[in-house]
């Protein structure tokens, strides 16, 4: 069962809403049903149990309350829940919805920590169910248990649930750079893999007033220019050619007119492309390997 083509976003509290960032998610993915949640729509559409409402009311931090609503919405509707401080770069590909998913927060800065910035599930999925079960059976008052909200009911809770699963195949965990290429600690992704969104870390940096005027870093945006390279069917040096290309800055369209074994080799280079680095990050664009002018994923 694939993830429903629904995008959820939520905003509660008195702070100005990062509307431009949120619109970037909505407008970049027009084939998705878009569901915006606020205090009014939550009251009108969500039939939340009294016990769960009591837990939400016990939690003092607005970001923690948002996390608590998030779990309920994902369990009931399924779909893709995207934080309000995420900015879209390219549309979400359909293959992402083949299985429930989230990503790591950052493999270097915070190994094994699951990110809640974008999560996607089928309805009644085991992960939101287990998260809600834990919430109902534990004290989630941050000031009392002296645990920060993100660790108690956000990424920390997602990580605990995921790592406790006997069958982890129920969800796909994508690399952090898919959705969080620039971490709030300063670690930045400099590879050539496809980046779908950036995260502006609004609650961490307390910068929601600035998010709507921020620009996407150049090295994450799709390139404006590219170089077309055709590989004929008599080329026996494909590995040497690709080894040379991976050390160059730029965007290369590889048009295959060669044997199937070479096509297979190019497809296998996905991990190599993800780990590419450059000496001149200001001039970095992305490699795009094409199979008969279609992007290979």
What are these regions (language model features)?
Residues 27, 79, 112, 245-247, ...:
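Generic structural signal for beta-strand residues in well-ordered domains
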Residues 77-78, 190-192, 201, 243, ...:
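Feature targets compositionally biased, intrinsically disordered low-complexity regions
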Residues 213-297:
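Non-catalytic N-terminal targeting/anchoring module and adjacent flexible stem/linker
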Residues 29, 78, 166, 270-273:
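Glycine-centered loop/turn motif at secondary-structure junctions
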Residues 22-26, 71, 93, 158-163, ...:
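Short amphipathic alpha-helical segments and helix-helix/interface helices
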Residues 67-79:
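Small-residue hinge/turn detector
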Residues 1-66, 82-226:
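Glycosyltransferase-associated regions of secretory-pathway enzymes
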Residues 16, 77, 206, 271, ...:
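Enrichment for repetitive, rod-forming helical segments
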């Amino acid at each position: 069962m694939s993830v429903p083509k629904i995008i959820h976003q939520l905003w509660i509290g008195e702070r100005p809403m990062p509307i431009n960032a949120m619109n970037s998610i909505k407008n970049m993915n027009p084939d998705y049903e878009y569901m915006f949640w606020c205090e009014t729509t939550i009251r009108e559409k969500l039939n939340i149990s009294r016990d769960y409402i009591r837990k939400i009311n016990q939690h003092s931090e607005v970001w923690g309350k948002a996390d608590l609503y998030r779990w309920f919405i994902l369990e009931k509707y399924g779909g893709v829940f995207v934080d309000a401080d995420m900015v879209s770069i390219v549309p979400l590909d359909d293959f992402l919805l083949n299985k429930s998913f989230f990503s790591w927060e950052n493999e270097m800065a915070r190994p094994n920590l699951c990110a809640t910035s974008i999560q996607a599930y089928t309805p009644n999925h085991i992960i939101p169910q287990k998260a809600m079960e834990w919430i109902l059976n534990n004290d989630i008052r941050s000031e009392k248990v002296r645990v920060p909200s993100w660790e108690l009911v956000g990424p920390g809770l997602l990580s605990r649930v995921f790592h406790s699963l006997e069958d982890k195949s129920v969800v796909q965990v994508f690399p952090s750079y898919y959705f969080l290429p620039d971490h709030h600690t300063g670690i930045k992704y400099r590879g050539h893999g496809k980046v779908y969104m950036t995260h502006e870390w609004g609650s961490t940096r307390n910068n929601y007033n600035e998010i709507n005027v921020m620009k996407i870093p150049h090295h994450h945006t799709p390139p404006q220019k590219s170089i077309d390279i055709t590989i004929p069917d008599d080329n026996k040096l494909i590995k040497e050619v690709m080894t040379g290309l991976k050390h160059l800055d730029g965007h290369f369209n590889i048009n295959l007119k060669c044997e199937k074994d070479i096509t297979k080799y190019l497809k296998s280079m996905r991990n190599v492309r993800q780990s590419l680095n450059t000496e001149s990050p200001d001039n970095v664009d992305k490699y795009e390997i094409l199979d008969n002018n279609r992007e290979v994923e």
